[in-house]
Amino acid sequence: MENNVIKDGFVSFLGYKTYYRIVNPCGKKVPLVICHGGPGSTHNSYEVLDDMAFKEDRPIVRYDQLGCGLSSLSSPHTYLWNKETWMDELNNLREKLGLKKIHLRGHSWGGRLALLYLLDRKPDGVLSVTLSSTLSSASLWKEETHHLLSYLPSYEKEALLKAEEAMDFSSLEYHNAYEHYYHLFIGGPF
C-alpha cells in the first residue's frame, strides 16, 4: 500500500509508547478500532482487513497493546499487564488520536478487553462492538485448557504449569511444550 494511505506512529502512555497504524486515515465513515488477541499478540494479523478500509471509506485503527509488538515493553514492570492498564491505554489511544466515535472489534483476548472496556468504563462514542473468537468465561477457558494438558507428556505439562505459576515464559522447556500444545490443540505448527 502507498504511504499516503497509511499513518502510523506512537502515542505516549505511562512513560511508554503505544504503536498504532491507521489504514485510510482520511476515510469519511466512523473508524474501526481493533483490539488484538493475546495478551501478547500484535496488530499484524489484521492486515487482511486493510482493503475493507477503502471499500467502506472507513479508517481502520490497529494498535499494539503495551508490552506487545512495536509498543514499549514494560518488563520488568509486569505489574502493568492487567485489564486496568489496557483499558486506560485504549482510552488514551482514543484521546490522543481524536477518536470520539468508533466501532470496536476485539479478537480473542481483545474481545475480552472490548467487553471489559464497555462494561467497566461505559465509554461514550462506541457505536458498535464486534467480537471474534472471544471466550465467554475466563475461568471455564482456564479449566478447559488445563484439561488439555492431561494429553501432553508429563514433562511438557510440568513446564507449562511451572511457567504459568512463576509468570516466567522464557525457558526453552516452556517454548517447546507450548509449541507442541499449539500444534495439537490450536492450529497446527507455527
How would you label these PLM feature ranges?
Residues 27-29, 95-101, 123:
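Active-site acidic short loop of glycosyltransferases
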Residues 62-109, 113:
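Active-site loop/oxyanion-hole signature of alpha/beta-hydrolase fold enzymes
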Residues 127-168:
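Flexible "cap/lid" loop of the alpha/beta hydrolase fold
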